[in-house]
């Protein structure tokens, strides 16, 4: 079997801890008489609950308690909370403020937090302290790649002894595992593995900065749901609704899939041929959530399930495909909430009171962006969040907005379920602003109806005596004349084609008589068309609207007459040649120049006709 990752950094840390333990400091005034740690490894998010009993053995009162973590562990610390109460004092535990500190004379490979006590701990007094720490990326898949049929094995590294700057009289460690097999674990005296629980200790009389490296290599097939980014938009409408839209980009953060994926094997035996994958996520929505939808880039996803009662609304999100290690998917969840359940009034202000994180269970969000869209006209905006976040403000424009809607943007990294706490956004909003958009709609429809009435009752026609009307009439007349002229010239071109056809028939049959009849018919048609064209040209020339088109028409007439002459001349030459019984080559030589001229003129006439038709 492969060996878990080396512990070189842990060994180096041990040397520093030994040096730190030999440094006398004022921290020796406190003694941890008992330390009980409970580590929950059932998920990919590690939760450690440390119960401490602390005694002040020094001569002076102490107002703070130091918590120490190795840097390699502190960099993955997502949340830390401390609760304390003095012995023999009745009442609930007090939440203690915690901040990062750097005491003098300690190794830089350690990160220290200071818990400020609610009141100084006097000499000889005892304090009960509960510390909850939550770590991300502390459970690593090993091996890093597995096949579809293999279970997922992970490794967790910690210390079997409680790392503290104070001496510890008695300490125990209990590690809760998800079940399944345990490949290996570090064994020390008083180590016991019973079913899904691994215990170390009790260990007594430990000096400050005691550290015993411990590694657990075990099976964990629970969903390693890691969201690369989640954008959560909360839009407030004072017409009675809070609309929430959440965009997810989720990946499986466990061991990557090695080899090919077989859907047939997965569907036939999903709990054997896909034990390390996850096919659904659970989102716990507020009780009165409504208008719930779940979709991705393709569209609505129908493979979701919804349950609701008076206490909660549960949505089971099932992607289109199961997620194995390294795979990812994107989807969107949207739902509405009653306004009166989440927006309240206080001291002349309104405030939104809603949870910060995602409703999806056991999900790690590497980057969460929460956008609170306030109604247009909101001002005096204040934000209260129970933990540090990056805060910005922007403006969003929607339907009928004039100045835009203020948007509060909150951004936080490494968000876990413990961050799903309530936060508040305070703002001032005048109820009169509610009427702005309805009044805009009413005014718009009123103006539209008034415009329709005015339009229906107003004579919009152009006067027959106005210059524009007269110009339009004249232009219509010009267009009518142009259409008639085009029709005449099209007839001329048709007559040209008949002459060409008669020559082809002559070369085929040698019928000179029929060819002469065709020429005579064409000549008569040309004369008739010229008579029809003459009055049209006169009318066109006299119109004031034809100044642009008349030069082209005049050029067209000249080219057409020249084309007719050339056609008739060529026709006569060919007929005479046939009557004289000349050879075909001699005929071609006689009409070659005429043929080129006829083709060029025909092209010019057609171009002029096309130009006139476009005008």
Swiss-Prot record:
Glycans are attached at residues 300, 353, 431. Residues 1-28 form the signal peptide. The modification N6-acetyllysine is found at residue 187. GO terms for cellular component: oligosaccharyltransferase complex. Pfam families: Ribophorin_I. Residues 456-615 are cytoplasmic. Belongs to the OST1 family. Subunit of the oligosaccharyl transferase (OST) complex that catalyzes the initial transfer of a defined glycan (Glc(3)Man(9)GlcNAc(2) in eukaryotes) from the lipid carrier dolichol-pyrophosphate to an asparagine residue within an Asn-X-Ser/Thr consensus motif in nascent polypeptide chains, the first step in protein N-glycosylation. N-glycosylation occurs cotranslationally and the complex associates with the Sec61 complex at the channel-forming translocon complex that mediates protein translocation across the endoplasmic reticulum (ER). All subunits are required for a maximal enzyme activity. This is Dolichyl-diphosphooligosaccharide--protein glycosyltransferase subunit 1A. The gene is OST1A.
